[in-house]
């Protein structure tokens, strides 16, 4: 995540994170929604916090760069 956020070659707004969202099932946020990446949570501008263990997939554009096995 830090690579996409801080490296000048990447546009962080193209990052998409899919995560388990109770009770909805799955939800997705973009890099533009992310305020801070903490040790255990990703904090959103909306005030929500996504625990790292609920993340199931990270994409950059259309490419899946990480998927939970």
Swiss-Prot record:
Pfam families: MJ1316. It comes from the Archaea. Belongs to the UPF0248 family. HAMAP family: UPF0248 (MF_01245). This is UPF0248 protein AF_0420. It comes from Archaeoglobus fulgidus (strain ATCC 49558 / DSM 4304 / JCM 9628 / NBRC 100126 / VC-16).
